[in-house]
């Protein structure tokens, strides 16, 4: 389908200094809670920089992938390989669902009308806010599930997380880490490293699906912007890591949850003039 000009934002801002600054702010927020911050970057891509929903999701996914690749060596170095190897079945169990979920989620995203995608993203932002509060204020304990039930639950949870990660363009660590702790009774530090091993192939599958629709055109036309914002995100994440614990969780977590909820409200009202996605080929 030819691009519908009515759905293309009137003004896309690609200022490199602004991109770096916004990326740094997002990285710092994520770094202070041990995450990448992609859920905070998505509403900025739409609201501040003016990208249409699907374009913003694809850009966010690209940036999330680079941030994960950058963080992977350092994160894996904090956990002995033997500890990770002992839990390889957990990674396989979750990937069995998340890879399918990533493909399905990306397929749904490219087929959704623009107005629908904005509302879906808003709902998922609310989900992320709830997950943020629950995982940082409540003690997550393992569920006493029989082996076969746990395996089925792992596939189902992986599928759901893969869908969410693909549609939002995030790595999914916000949901993967508590899931690993809850289903498999694994220490949260090890769970963080295992989540990266699940996130990376899951994101690659979502990319593969998006590329079938020519959606990567937004990356080619905004390459400098993407690289600059990623550089800011990485710098911000390092700063956020240094600030870890400076702001008490009882203050930081509710504040971040409120930011997500405000972003969700704005996304829900951010419907394009035409319901199809801006400037991206149809299937």
Outline where the language-model segments fall.
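Juxtamembrane transmembrane-helix boundary motif
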Residues: 1-28, 46-48, 53-55, 73-166, ...
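Generic structural signal for well-ordered secondary structure
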Residues: 38, 59-62, 66, 89, ...
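Alpha-helical transmembrane segments and their lipid-water interface positions
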Residues: 38, 64-75, 105, 202-210, ...
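Residue-level recognition of oxygen-bearing side chains
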Residues: 40, 61, 175, 196, ...
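Non-catalytic alpha-helical scaffold/packing segments enriched in small hydrophobic residues
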Residues: 154, 175-179, 199, 203
């Amino acid at each position: 389908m030819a691009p519908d000009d009515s759905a293309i934002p009137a003004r896309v801002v690609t200022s490199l200094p602004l991109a770096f600054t916004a990326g740094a702010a997002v990285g710092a927020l994520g770094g202070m809670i041990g995450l990448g911050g992609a859920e905070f970057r998505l509403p900025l891509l739409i609201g501040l920089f003016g990208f249409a929903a699907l374009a913003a999701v694809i850009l966010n996914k690209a940036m999330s992938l680079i941030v994960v690749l950058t963080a992977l060596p350092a994160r894996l170095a904090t956990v002995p390989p033997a500890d990770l190897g002992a839990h390889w079945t957990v990674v396989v169990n979750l990937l069995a669902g998340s890879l399918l979920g990533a493909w399905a989620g990306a397929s749904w995203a490219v087929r959704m009308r623009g107005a629908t995608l904005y509302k879906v993203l808003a709902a998922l932002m609310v989900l992320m806010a709830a997950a943020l509060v629950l995982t940082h204020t409540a003690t997550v304990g393992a569920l006493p599930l029989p082996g076969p039930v746990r395996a089925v639950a792992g596939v189902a949870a992986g599928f759901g997380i893969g869908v969410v990660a693909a549609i939002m363009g995030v790595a999914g660590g916000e949901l993967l880490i508590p899931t690993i702790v809850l289903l498999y009774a694994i220490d949260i530090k090890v769970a963080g490293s295992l989540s990266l091993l699940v996130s990376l192939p899951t994101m690659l599958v979502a990319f593969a699906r998006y590329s079938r629709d020519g959606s990567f055109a937004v990356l080619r036309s905004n390459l400098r912007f993407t690289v600059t914002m990623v550089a800011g995100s990485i710098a911000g994440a390092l700063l956020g890591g240094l600030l870890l614990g400076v702001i008490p969780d009882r203050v930081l977590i509710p504040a971040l949850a409120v930011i997500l909820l405000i972003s969700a409200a704005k996304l829900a009202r951010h419907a394009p003039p035409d319901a199809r996605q801006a400037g991206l080929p149809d299937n």
